[in-house]
A protein has these predicted regions:
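A short, N-terminal "cap"/entry segment at the start of jelly-roll beta-barrel domains
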Residues: 2-50, 88, 96, 126-134
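A short beta-loop-beta micro-motif enriched in histidine and acidic residues
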Residues: 40-44, 56-71
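Sec/Tat-exported extracytoplasmic proteins
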Residues: 51, 57, 73-76, 81, ...
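Short acidic-glycine-tyrosine-enriched beta hairpin
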Residues: 53-54, 83-100
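Histidine-centered metal-chelating micro-motifs
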Residues: 58-60, 78, 95-106
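Short histidine-centered beta-strand/loop micro-motifs
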Residues: 59-64, 81, 88, 106-108
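Glycine- and acidic-residue-biased ligand/ion/polar-headgroup-sensing regions
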Residues: 65-83, 93
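Ligand-binding loop in jelly-roll beta-barrel domains
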Residues: 86, 100-126
Length: 134
């Protein structure tokens, strides 16, 4: 009985260590909010964010409740927009995504890619809504 108890305790400790190790991994995409503020357009707000893409990373297909205006500051990404061909966007280049358009961006390079994004969106709505089953 004592042996089973020690085995169970060891299994729990192992599981907790494994979870801690996995949660310590760097995410493939990270969005850090830089600023969020009301603007003069009624019911709208501006949000600025830093997007960091590890190699192979991206947010997955999603939409925004307003326009996205982004500038690549490091590396390059491949931009995928519904109804348009994929486009490589590199450091020093920018792009605009219209409101509600399904899109994704992926870092297909070997180094980190970073963008600064400004969103002019409907206040009180989620900044990004994932799209599944595409």
């Amino acid at each position: 009985m004592a042996g089973m108890k020690h085995t169970a305790i060891a299994a729990v400790i192992f599981a907790l260590v494994a979870i801690a190790a996995v949660s310590g991994q760097q995410p493939l995409f990270k969005r850090t909010m830089l600023q969020q503020q009301d603007i003069s357009a009624p019911g709208r707000e501006a949000v600025m964010a830093l997007g960091e893409f590890q190699p192979g990373g991206g947010p997955g297909p999603h939409t925004h409740p307003g326009e996205e205006i982004s500038y690549v500051i490091e590396g390059s990404i491949v931009l995928e927009q519904a109804g348009k061909p994929n486009v490589a966007v590199k450091a020093g280049e920018s792009f605009i995504i219209p409101a509600g358009v399904v899109h994704n961006a992926t870092n297909r390079g070997t180094g980190v890619a970073k963008i600064v994004a400004t969103y002019v969106v409907e206040k009180g709505k989620p900044l990004a809504t994932p799209v599944t089953g595409r």
